[in-house]
Amino acid sequence: MDYGAKGDGITDDAAAIQRAIDACSAKGGGQVYLPCAKTFLAGPIDLKSNIDLHLDAGSVLKANPDESIYKLSAFKENRGEGMMWLHCKDIENLSITGTGTIHGNGIAFMGAELFDSYELKPLKDPTFDPRPHVLTLIGVKRLVIRDVTIREGAYWTVHLIGCQDAVIDGISLLNNVKIRNGDGIDVDHSKNVRISNCHITSGDDCICLKNRREWEEYGACTDIVVTNCVMTSRSCAIKIGSENMDSIVRVMIDNCVITASNRGIGIQNRDEGTVTDVVFSNITLDSHLFSDVWWGKAEPIYVTSYPRANGNHKDANWRFPKGQIEGRCGEVSRITFNNIVATSENGCFVGGDTRDKVNHIYFNNVRLHLKKVTDYRGGVYDKRPCKGEGFIKSDVFGVYVEEATGVQMHHLEVVCDKPSVPNFGGDTNL
């Protein structure tokens, strides 16, 4: 049945697509089909239970560039970190499939292009950021995202909040690497999530596990598997944190390739939550330096727990515990790195606020080739966001440890191109 979408790339088809979704869901479910060779410009769309949103080859669903139509915050009362475009809450049996494209129209929401990033447009209200997140999926039970291409997000791209039993398979997520906050996939307070066979390019983190304070009712982030993915990021390709007010536990990340990234693998715990029982295995990565706009100093492996930098009145109730403007950091423990091959301008970094915060970190069969490839100055490790000084200036070590216990290394090999890395300090600083 045709619900009146034009597909001309000019008319806003959100109302027509919404009618199709509502009618399909009301009848118990089915497929909402976007045909080939058409571009469907659309504002916000509310997805429903028992729907397969199917994008045929050559079809494009594109975000309307009119900032004024995005009314729903992606983070509840916190309106300072973007709005929702394609969204849903507390539904079940949702799938997004096909070989068509979901286009976030990201450049339309940017300011001037700089050499390393885009400026953000000046905000009329500093507490309100109108940039739309592409997919904000809240409390979905049984979710599938398969085969689609998602391009040019203006803010976070795929955000799973409190989802259970989710599969993301075979997608290409291709963001502009100059767009700040352009996360790829954020797994937030979610359980039983499998991400596989994906190609992800993003300015911010490609895949990020976290527990945001706004969504604490959904509990811990647990039982996550990432396999067979290829990633490029100007921040961190695979990250846990920095937001973590609960626990992140039982995570397996295996058989991945990371190219032309800033950080490769990162645990960046900055809140009171804990990170335990995580295994990274069979990963090859290439990390190098970018400008200070991006967190990270080319650390191929980064395991940290530090208190977040003190906030202000805007941070109370969402960045820190209710009513507070500062927080504390939780424990990071039982983290294993197996069979990692890295080429990088910097060494690995392991550190905590106190020695008990980071413990039982295992490096098994890790090979690191230190090689200078950019003109950015090295010899710095990046602790941001944290209280106090965010950078540690040091010689470059294969593994630099600051305030941690139980760090074990078995078959760690560090090869240094000494002419290009004259400040090489050795395999470790221990």
Roles of regions detected by a PLM:
Residues M1-L430:
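Extracellular/periplasmic carbohydrate-active domains that bind, remodel
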